[in-house]
Design a protein with these regions (language model features):
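N-terminal alpha/beta PP-like core and its mobile active-site loop of ThDP/TPP-dependent enzymes
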Residues: 2-178
Length: 178
């Protein structure tokens, strides 16, 4: 009988560490607006046993669903979408969360830096797109260039920024290569 060894994946592992840290901190609800670029994010959160995932095809509806989950539970909800205008559709719910001091952790998938600014479809400048409506924002490194401890640290900062003094939404932009 042979034992199988888990296969390490340089893209998935930091994202899974991020999701696991949020779960360890008390996050329970994740709202996913599916898209191809956000697949690694969606899979990492969906497969974590302590997290409940809710699939919402319409991003605007997803944003308000996550807002309602966070209001009802008092815990941050995670919101995940693909790149481009999908992220723009979250803005109304993020503005509402900002003014109502509702914690949300918004994770937007994006193209890697070398593919930005070329006029490709579903491409907008996502870095800082929610500016004054979030407590903290980060344009993260490409996951394969990132360590699991750094991912856990980013998750902790996102969580603490969302639930700390002046509770509200935070934004993490995830550049993902296909």
């Amino acid at each position: 009988m042979t034992e199988s060894t888990p296969v390490s994946d340089p893209v998935y592992d930091p994202i899974a560490a991020f999701a696991g840290q949020l779960a360890a901190l008390g996050v329970r609800d994740v709202v996913i607006s599916p898209g191809s670029r956000s697949t690694p994010l969606s899979l990492a959160f969906h497969t974590h046993p302590a997290l409940r995932t809710h699939i919402q095809l319409d991003e605007r509806s997803a944003g308000f669903f996550a807002l309602g989950q966070a209001k009802a539970s008092g815990r941050p909800s995670v919101l995940i979408c693909t790149s481009g205008t999908a992220a723009a559709n979250y803005l109304p719910a993020i503005v509402e969360a900002n003014h109502a001091c509702v914690p949300m952790i918004v994770c937007t998938a994006d193209r890697p830096p070398e593919l930005r600014g070329w006029g490709a479809g579903q491409t907008i400048d996502q870095v800082g797109m929610y500016t004054t409506n979030v407590r903290w924002a980060a344009d993260l490194p490409v996951p394969s260039d990132w360590s699991e401890p750094a991912a856990r640290l980013a998750a902790t900062r996102a969580y603490e920024s969302s639930v700390g003094a002046g509770r509200g939404p935070v934004h993490l932009n995830w550049p993902l290569r296909k």
